[in-house]
A protein has these predicted regions:
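Auxiliary tRNA-acceptor-end handling modules of aminoacyl-tRNA synthetases
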Residues: 1-164, 168-169, 174-179, 183
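Hydrophobic, small-residue-rich alpha-helical packing segments that form membrane-like cores
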Residues: 196-197
């Protein structure tokens, strides 16, 4: 009975850019005006805590058109914050028995073909680049690399569980309409860990 239109946006029919654009309305409704007002007040409070607003106010990160959408640039203040969070996480991971690893940003397509990424995840990957006649891809996730590291040397049951972790930069092709601050980006630092038993 009590409703409010909250926002509107454009969307492609069935999510396909080749189809016509439709107008999407977002709204909410409640049984009484008191609950509606309470909900709208909560939304206003959330806006004050929006990471995009805080990031700008505290000069932590920004996006630049020449760099490209979904590719955040971290300022010195933001980098200090990231470094502190990473140090805390690394401390916890070390205490949990994780070993740190590093993996490359580019990989031959063969690895992603074997891992199933090309069959099941290619629409979220950037197009390949040709290097000496071989397709290379920017990594969308760290898993296949970690599996390679685990398989690189023979393991005894005494070596298990084998724990590795990494702050790997991953790249995902997010469509422009899917990008949202730091929540949906095209380049991200992913804290990733794997346990082999």
């Amino acid at each position: 009975k009590h409703f409010k239109i909250l926002s509107s946006s454009a969307a492609y029919w069935r999510g396909d850019e080749k189809n016509q654009t439709l107008q999407r309305l977002y709204g909410t409704s409640f049984q009484n005006s008191k609950d509606l007002k309470k909900y709208l007040l909560m939304l206003e409070e959330q806006k004050k805590r929006d990471h995009r607003k805080i990031g700008k106010e505290l000069d932590l990160f920004f996006f630049d058109d020449e760099v490209g959408p979904g590719l955040p640039l971290w300022t010195p203040s933001g980098t200090v914050l990231i470094d502190e969070l990473e140090a805390l996480a690394k401390e916890k991971e070390t205490a949990g028995g994780y070993l740190r690893v590093r993996t490359p940003h580019l990989t031959k397509g063969d690895l992603f073909s074997k891992s199933g990424h090309l069959d099941h995840y290619m629409s979220s990957m950037f197009s390949p680049m040709d290097v000496d006649g071989i397709d290379y891809y920017m990594k969308p996730m760290n898993c296949p690399y970690h599996h390679k590291i685990f398989a690189n040397t023979p393991k005894s049951y005494r070596d298990l569980p084998y724990r590795i972790s990494e702050y790997g930069t991953c790249y995902r092709y997010e469509k422009s309409g899917e990008l949202f601050g730091l929540m949906r980006v095209r380049s991200m630092q992913m804290n990733d860990g794997h346990i082999y038993c």
